[in-house]
Amino acid sequence: MAETRSSPEERRPGGILRAAAVSRQFEGVRALERVTLELHRHEVVGLIGPNGAGKTTLVNLITGFDFPSSGTVELEEIDITAWPPHRRSRAGLARTFQQGHVFRGLTVRENVEVSALGVGARPTEARRRSEGLLGMLGLAQRAEQQAAVLPHGEERLLGVARALASEPRFLLMDEPAAGLHEAEVAEFAEVVRRVRDEHETGVLLIDHNIGLIMGVCDRIHVLDQGKTLAEGTPADVRRNVDVAAAYLGRRNGEGAE
Protein backbone atom coordinates (compact mmCIF):
# COMPACT_ATOMS: atom_id res chain seq x y z
CA MET A 1 0.00 0.00 0.00
CA ALA A 2 1.45 3.38 -0.97
CA GLU A 3 1.98 5.75 1.92
CA THR A 4 -0.18 8.86 1.83
CA ARG A 5 1.07 11.84 3.78
CA SER A 6 -0.71 15.03 4.74
CA SER A 7 0.81 18.29 3.62
CA PRO A 8 3.29 20.18 5.84
CA GLU A 9 0.56 22.77 6.42
CA GLU A 10 -1.72 20.10 7.82
CA ARG A 11 0.97 18.68 10.15
CA ARG A 12 2.37 21.87 11.66
CA PRO A 13 3.85 20.96 15.07
CA GLY A 14 2.58 22.33 18.37
CA GLY A 15 -0.27 24.80 18.69
CA ILE A 16 -3.85 24.91 19.85
CA LEU A 17 -7.18 23.45 18.79
CA ARG A 18 -9.75 26.24 18.97
CA ALA A 19 -13.45 26.62 18.37
CA ALA A 20 -13.87 30.38 18.01
CA ALA A 21 -17.29 31.94 18.68
CA VAL A 22 -19.08 29.00 17.06
CA SER A 23 -22.87 28.97 16.78
CA ARG A 24 -25.16 26.29 15.38
CA GLN A 25 -28.80 26.73 14.50
CA PHE A 26 -31.23 23.93 13.56
CA GLU A 27 -34.52 25.04 11.97
CA GLY A 28 -34.66 28.18 14.07
CA VAL A 29 -33.44 26.56 17.28
CA ARG A 30 -30.01 27.76 18.40
CA ALA A 31 -28.12 24.75 19.75
CA LEU A 32 -24.89 26.70 20.33
CA GLU A 33 -24.39 30.44 20.70
CA ARG A 34 -20.92 31.97 20.26
CA VAL A 35 -19.02 29.31 22.19
CA THR A 36 -15.23 29.59 22.31
CA LEU A 37 -13.16 26.67 23.56
CA GLU A 38 -9.39 26.14 23.43
CA LEU A 39 -7.45 22.91 23.89
CA HIS A 40 -3.67 22.87 24.19
CA ARG A 41 -1.44 19.86 23.71
CA HIS A 42 -0.46 18.03 26.90
CA GLU A 43 -3.61 18.98 28.81
CA VAL A 44 -7.01 17.46 29.56
CA VAL A 45 -10.04 19.73 29.29
CA GLY A 46 -13.42 18.52 30.51
CA LEU A 47 -16.63 19.51 28.70
CA ILE A 48 -19.72 19.16 30.87
CA GLY A 49 -23.30 20.35 30.98
CA PRO A 50 -26.87 19.09 31.35
CA ASN A 51 -28.45 16.95 28.65
CA GLY A 52 -29.17 19.17 25.66
CA ALA A 53 -26.53 21.73 26.64
CA GLY A 54 -24.80 21.42 23.26
CA LYS A 55 -21.81 19.22 24.11
CA THR A 56 -22.15 16.71 21.28
CA THR A 57 -23.04 19.49 18.84
CA LEU A 58 -19.79 21.27 19.74
CA VAL A 59 -17.78 18.06 19.34
CA ASN A 60 -19.38 17.46 15.94
CA LEU A 61 -18.42 20.97 14.81
CA ILE A 62 -14.83 20.51 15.96
CA THR A 63 -14.42 17.11 14.30
CA GLY A 64 -16.17 17.95 11.02
CA PHE A 65 -19.28 15.82 11.41
CA ASP A 66 -21.26 19.06 11.31
CA PHE A 67 -20.46 22.66 10.42
CA PRO A 68 -21.13 25.89 12.35
CA SER A 69 -23.71 28.44 11.29
CA SER A 70 -21.11 31.04 12.27
CA GLY A 71 -17.68 31.09 13.86
CA THR A 72 -14.57 29.09 13.00
CA VAL A 73 -12.65 25.98 14.01
CA GLU A 74 -8.87 26.34 13.98
CA LEU A 75 -6.16 23.69 14.26
CA GLU A 76 -2.76 25.20 15.01
CA GLU A 77 -3.82 28.56 13.55
CA ILE A 78 -5.18 26.96 10.36
CA ASP A 79 -8.88 27.50 9.62
CA ILE A 80 -10.32 23.98 9.26
CA THR A 81 -13.99 24.98 9.51
CA ALA A 82 -14.89 23.55 6.09
CA TRP A 83 -12.65 20.47 6.27
CA PRO A 84 -14.31 17.01 6.26
CA PRO A 85 -13.55 14.58 9.11
CA HIS A 86 -10.94 12.51 7.23
CA ARG A 87 -8.86 15.59 6.46
CA ARG A 88 -8.98 16.69 10.09
CA SER A 89 -7.90 13.20 11.13
CA ARG A 90 -4.85 13.33 8.88
CA ALA A 91 -4.02 16.74 10.32
CA GLY A 92 -3.85 15.36 13.86
CA LEU A 93 -7.42 15.44 15.24
CA ALA A 94 -9.05 12.22 16.44
CA ARG A 95 -12.28 11.27 18.18
CA THR A 96 -13.73 8.37 20.14
CA PHE A 97 -17.46 7.64 19.99
CA GLN A 98 -20.09 6.78 22.59
CA GLN A 99 -20.72 3.37 21.00
CA GLY A 100 -17.05 2.42 20.72
CA HIS A 101 -16.94 2.61 16.90
CA VAL A 102 -15.02 -0.65 16.37
CA PHE A 103 -15.10 -3.20 13.55
CA ARG A 104 -16.64 -6.18 15.33
CA GLY A 105 -15.75 -8.61 12.53
CA LEU A 106 -12.01 -7.85 12.78
CA THR A 107 -9.56 -8.87 15.45
CA VAL A 108 -8.51 -6.39 18.10
CA ARG A 109 -5.10 -6.05 16.43
CA GLU A 110 -6.64 -5.53 12.99
CA ASN A 111 -8.93 -2.81 14.35
CA VAL A 112 -5.95 -0.75 15.47
CA GLU A 113 -3.91 -1.44 12.34
CA VAL A 114 -6.76 -0.34 10.07
CA SER A 115 -6.85 3.02 11.84
CA ALA A 116 -3.12 3.50 11.36
CA LEU A 117 -3.30 2.49 7.71
CA GLY A 118 -6.16 4.94 7.22
CA VAL A 119 -3.86 7.89 7.93
CA GLY A 120 -1.07 6.65 5.68
CA ALA A 121 1.07 4.39 7.88
CA ARG A 122 2.87 1.52 6.16
CA PRO A 123 1.86 -2.02 7.23
CA THR A 124 4.98 -2.52 9.36
CA GLU A 125 4.41 0.81 11.09
CA ALA A 126 0.73 0.00 11.61
CA ARG A 127 1.72 -3.28 13.30
CA ARG A 128 4.22 -1.45 15.53
CA ARG A 129 1.61 1.09 16.61
CA SER A 130 -0.92 -1.65 17.27
CA GLU A 131 1.45 -3.64 19.46
CA GLY A 132 2.48 -0.58 21.44
CA LEU A 133 -1.03 0.71 22.03
CA LEU A 134 -2.53 -2.65 22.93
CA GLY A 135 0.28 -3.14 25.41
CA MET A 136 -0.25 0.30 26.93
CA LEU A 137 -3.99 -0.23 27.29
CA GLY A 138 -3.78 -3.76 28.68
CA LEU A 139 -5.28 -5.39 25.59
CA ALA A 140 -2.23 -7.28 24.32
CA GLN A 141 -3.67 -10.62 25.40
CA ARG A 142 -6.79 -9.87 23.34
CA ALA A 143 -4.92 -8.99 20.14
CA GLU A 144 -6.01 -12.00 18.06
CA GLN A 145 -9.56 -12.19 19.41
CA GLN A 146 -12.55 -10.83 17.54
CA ALA A 147 -13.58 -7.38 18.69
CA ALA A 148 -17.15 -8.70 18.96
CA VAL A 149 -16.29 -10.76 22.05
CA LEU A 150 -14.82 -7.91 24.09
CA PRO A 151 -16.65 -6.87 27.26
CA HIS A 152 -17.92 -3.30 27.33
CA GLY A 153 -14.97 -1.79 29.19
CA GLU A 154 -12.39 -3.34 26.88
CA GLU A 155 -14.36 -2.29 23.81
CA ARG A 156 -14.09 1.30 25.06
CA LEU A 157 -10.32 0.87 25.42
CA LEU A 158 -10.13 -0.51 21.89
CA GLY A 159 -11.90 2.62 20.69
CA VAL A 160 -9.17 4.68 22.36
CA ALA A 161 -6.45 2.53 20.77
CA ARG A 162 -8.02 3.02 17.34
CA ALA A 163 -8.08 6.78 17.85
CA LEU A 164 -4.47 6.88 19.07
CA ALA A 165 -3.29 4.78 16.12
CA SER A 166 -3.51 7.91 13.97
CA GLU A 167 -1.01 9.55 16.37
CA PRO A 168 -3.23 12.58 16.95
CA ARG A 169 -2.12 15.75 18.62
CA PHE A 170 -5.68 16.31 19.85
CA LEU A 171 -8.16 13.63 20.95
CA LEU A 172 -11.85 14.20 21.70
CA MET A 173 -13.47 11.54 23.89
CA ASP A 174 -17.28 11.47 23.81
CA GLU A 175 -18.80 9.77 26.91
CA PRO A 176 -15.94 7.24 27.29
CA ALA A 177 -16.95 6.23 30.83
CA ALA A 178 -20.61 5.50 30.03
CA GLY A 179 -21.49 2.04 31.31
CA LEU A 180 -18.20 1.48 33.12
CA HIS A 181 -18.21 0.37 36.76
CA GLU A 182 -16.23 2.23 39.41
CA ALA A 183 -13.01 0.24 39.10
CA GLU A 184 -13.06 0.57 35.31
CA VAL A 185 -13.55 4.34 35.59
CA ALA A 186 -10.48 4.58 37.84
CA GLU A 187 -8.45 2.58 35.32
CA PHE A 188 -9.74 4.73 32.49
CA ALA A 189 -8.69 7.90 34.31
CA GLU A 190 -5.14 6.57 34.35
CA VAL A 191 -5.36 5.88 30.60
CA VAL A 192 -6.36 9.51 29.99
CA ARG A 193 -3.39 10.73 32.03
CA ARG A 194 -1.03 8.50 30.06
CA VAL A 195 -2.43 9.76 26.76
CA ARG A 196 -1.76 13.32 27.91
CA ASP A 197 1.68 12.70 29.42
CA GLU A 198 3.22 9.96 27.26
CA HIS A 199 1.71 10.92 23.92
CA GLU A 200 1.72 14.68 24.62
CA THR A 201 -1.83 14.80 23.33
CA GLY A 202 -4.46 17.39 24.15
CA VAL A 203 -7.60 15.59 25.35
CA LEU A 204 -11.13 17.00 25.35
CA LEU A 205 -13.14 14.77 27.68
CA ILE A 206 -16.95 14.85 27.49
CA ASP A 207 -18.61 12.82 30.21
CA HIS A 208 -21.39 12.89 32.81
CA ASN A 209 -19.15 11.21 35.40
CA ILE A 210 -18.27 14.22 37.53
CA GLY A 211 -15.79 12.24 39.62
CA LEU A 212 -13.81 11.38 36.49
CA ILE A 213 -13.96 14.95 35.18
CA MET A 214 -12.90 16.53 38.47
CA GLY A 215 -10.16 13.97 39.03
CA VAL A 216 -8.41 13.98 35.67
CA CYS A 217 -9.01 17.36 34.00
CA ASP A 218 -6.67 20.33 34.11
CA ARG A 219 -9.48 22.69 33.09
CA ILE A 220 -13.25 22.36 32.71
CA HIS A 221 -15.62 24.11 30.28
CA VAL A 222 -19.30 24.13 31.24
CA LEU A 223 -22.13 24.53 28.73
CA ASP A 224 -25.75 25.28 29.55
CA GLN A 225 -28.48 25.85 26.96
CA GLY A 226 -25.90 26.21 24.21
CA LYS A 227 -23.83 28.89 25.95
CA THR A 228 -20.65 28.87 27.99
CA LEU A 229 -21.68 28.99 31.64
CA ALA A 230 -18.22 28.76 33.22
CA GLU A 231 -14.66 27.65 32.63
CA GLY A 232 -11.63 27.20 34.84
CA THR A 233 -9.85 24.70 37.04
CA PRO A 234 -11.84 21.90 38.69
CA ALA A 235 -11.67 23.86 41.95
CA ASP A 236 -13.01 26.99 40.24
CA VAL A 237 -15.89 25.10 38.65
CA ARG A 238 -16.71 23.25 41.86
CA ARG A 239 -17.13 26.58 43.67
CA ASN A 240 -19.14 28.24 40.90
CA VAL A 241 -22.69 28.92 42.11
CA ASP A 242 -24.15 29.01 38.58
CA VAL A 243 -22.67 25.61 37.76
CA ALA A 244 -23.93 24.19 41.03
CA ALA A 245 -27.45 25.37 40.26
CA ALA A 246 -27.55 24.42 36.58
CA TYR A 247 -25.64 21.17 36.54
CA LEU A 248 -24.58 19.77 39.88
CA GLY A 249 -27.99 20.15 41.47
CA ARG A 250 -26.96 22.58 44.21
CA ARG A 251 -28.67 25.82 45.10
CA ASN A 252 -28.08 28.84 47.32
CA GLY A 253 -24.33 28.94 46.87
CA GLU A 254 -23.48 25.51 48.25
CA GLY A 255 -20.40 23.83 46.81
CA ALA A 256 -20.77 20.65 44.79
CA GLU A 257 -19.65 17.38 46.23
Question: Where are the regions that the model predicts?
Answer:
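Glycine-rich phosphate-binding loops of nucleotide-dependent enzymes
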Residues: 2-257
